[in-house]
Structure formats: C-alpha cells, structure tokens
Amino acid sequence: MSPAPLRHLLLAGLSITMIAAPAAQSGPLPNGFQVVRSHAGVNFPTTLRFAPDGRLFFTELTGRVAYYPSLSYPSSVTWDFIPVMYDPSGEWGQHGMAVHPDFPDSPYVYLSYSNLSPLSDRLVRYTDKLGVASDSTVLMSVPADSPYHHGGRVAFGPDGMIYWSHGDQTDMASAQDPSALGGKIFRLGRGGLPAPGNPWGPSNPAIVMGIRNVFGLCFDPLNGTGYFTDNGPECDDEVNLLAFGANYGWGPNDPCNGQPAGTVPALATFNPTIAPTGCWLYRGNAYPSRYDGTLFFATWNDSRLYRVRFKANHPDQVDTLDVFYTFNEQVLDVTEGPDGFLWVATTGSIWRITYTNPTIAVDDPTPSPLLSLGVVPNPSYGAVAFNTRGSAASARLEVIDLQGRRWRSWSGPLSSHIAWDGRSDSGEPAPVGVYLVRLTSPLGTITRRLIRLGG
C-alpha cells in the first residue's frame, strides 16, 4: 500500500453531522442479495482478513489463528496457537489482526491479544513461513489488569502506519489523560515506535483519546477516511469518524446523552445499546454502484449488520443508517473478499453476502451463451491472456485492483485474445495482489478474479 495523505484524519475543518440512530427494523435483504454460510464450526472468530494471496485468515478468541487457503477450500488450516489470557467471564483473549499491505513480499501478520504471562495486551508481528507463523516480535505492550475493555483492533492506515485500539480497562480517567495508555487509539510505525507527527509529542503513541472500548476500526481504501465503533456503558454506543488529535469525550464527566465541551460528537449514537463490533468501508464492484462508499458495521446485542451511507463528497455527514441484515448469531466482524462480496463472522460461522442480477456475474462460468471471458494463467507470475467472446464495437475490458484503481483498459472492437504484460497504461508494473478483470458489452458484464503473484 502506498502512503496517502492524512487529509481525512485531520481535525481542522471537520464538520460532523451526528444522528441518533432510529429504532431499526429487520427485514429481507435488498433484491439480488443472498447470505450464504461459507464455513461452519469456527469458534468465536473475532477478526476476518483476506491476504493478497487469496487466503482468508481469522482469529479465534481463545488463541487459535487459522486460514482457508482459498475462497472455496472446505476446511481451515491452523497457522498458530497464541498463548492468550482467556476467561469466559471477561473480555481477555485474541482481539484483532492485520495483514501487511505488501504481503507476501513483506510476509507479516500482526496480532493483538491478551498475553497470558506476563499479563498484558500486546501487538505482535509474526512472519508467515510456508503457511505457518514464526519469528514473533512484540511491537507494543500495555497493561491488561482488568478483565474488561481491551479493544484490540488493529489496521493499517492510508499513511502506511499501524493503528491499534486499547480500551480504558475500566479506568475512565485514563481516557482523558493524554499521557495514559487507556482509552486511546495508537498510531505506530511498522517497528512499533510512535509514528512521526502524533499529536501529543514524538514519544506518545496515541492519535485520539476519550474512547471506552473500540471493537471496530477501518479505513476507506479510496480516500483514507478512518472510522471506528465504540461501546458505551448502558447508553451511547457510537460510530465515529477518526480525526487526528480528537477527544471523543469518554471519561468521568461523560454522562449518558451528554457531550463534554471540547469533544468530538459521534457520527451516530445508539440507545439502547447494540454493542458495535467490526466495520468495513465497501469499495468493491460486485454490488450495485449505490453501495460504493457504504460503511458496514456489525453488532453483538442485536446480531445485525448495519449500513451507513454518507452525503455525496462528505464522509463526515451521515445520509442514511439502517439494518442491512439480521443474523441468528451475534456478529463479530465484516470484511471484503477478493470476489468483491462482504464476508461476515458470527460466533460460530463465516458467511458470504453475494449479489447477482441478469447482467452482472462474478466468477460465473456461463453468464451468457454469447458472452465469455477467460483469464490464463491464473494465478499468474507474469503476463496473462484474456480470451473474450461476444465483444462488440462498444465493448470495454478493464483490470482493476481492490482499491478501485484501473490499471489497464481496452475499448473495442476487442480481439478475442488480449495479452496483458502486467503494467498500467503508462508502463507502471502492477504489484502483487488480487485484481478484477471486467468485460462490459451490450450483451452484459462479466467479472473475473485474477491473482497476480509477481512478474
């Protein structure tokens, strides 16, 4: 991931529109969507993350880290067992995970968990070697004396830095003390030291304060906007915009339905509480275009996946907020797969939310008898060939990465055999990763997934 400006993490000029979330009503999925159980038998999967090589990693609260080698692989492979502190009466355990954005060239996986001995919450970097974990390095360690409010979500930001949440450990005052570690989101360099430019000095790892227990942390891959969910006490669960140097108000003087002076209001608050968990900002192209830029977040109390739509060109102003789907188990995390679909973790299963309509198919081998698209070889270490049928004079073929960047395009009439050398229109080499190859013609649209391993 190339660093991007922090323009949406800057507090200056921020104009947040806050809403009190309405009482949500569950109902059927929007037309064309379907929820499919992809994997059963998982044990409290706190985090789902896809690696650029196509593996689906997940963490379990009790310490197991595992992955599915591909989207369709039936059983998981254990990557490691982490010696976590776990007590079912509290919130200790394994909480978060991030895969290095340059994986597998930088073969690192970052885990956040409550360490058993000595007792602490840790951010640890592991190396993936031949499909198993090795060479652990502790990047940061913070107190974990309380069984509650650990947070522990970890994500890479648009600037390439590591963002890690830590709850207040039931010490409300720590959330309002910039020098204390409780109730913060940290911004760290890849070696674990405080990142340059943090708001409270070069030795302070925190980027925001005044939080209670963050279980969701995500970034818009297109423009870098950050969002997080926070769990209130008996009131005021929140969805927040991540703003550099902001104080979100939680502390001894933060009453229910209050807003202490000098603090940043939430984008949305929930009363009664819903216990929000993981979040994801959708930029895929397997769903209708109206879902582009939609924030999805999961909840524990009501077992739902919510969606937030923002006003045009205003990622700090909520347009609509509603329930997308209600599951039959508590929901822990949501992420986007290389197929462009949302993948959701509940307490015992992993789900895939697919979408189909008469003119769009993703990895459908026979979307139309007159229209076809083949990608060979796939995965690829170098050049690939796109074999097309049914392309008319107005046809278009595109290669797009998962952040929405168009790397190469051809407009037609198209040849039935098109070679791609792995470079952009300007000659820039495309990095290792997952790409979508899309053929659009008057007969319809086909999208294929391409895994690029080198070249």
Write out the residue ranges for each language-model feature.
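Surface loop/turn motifs at the tips and blade-to-blade linkers of beta-strand repeat domains
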Residues: 37-43, 80-89, 140-146, 205-210, ...
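Blade-loop segments of beta-propeller domains
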Residues: 75-99
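Residue-level detector of functionally pivotal "anchor" positions at catalytic/ligand-binding pockets or at interdomain
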Residues: 356-376, 390, 406-407, 453-455
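C-terminal tail/sorting-segment detector
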Residues: 382-384, 411, 428-455
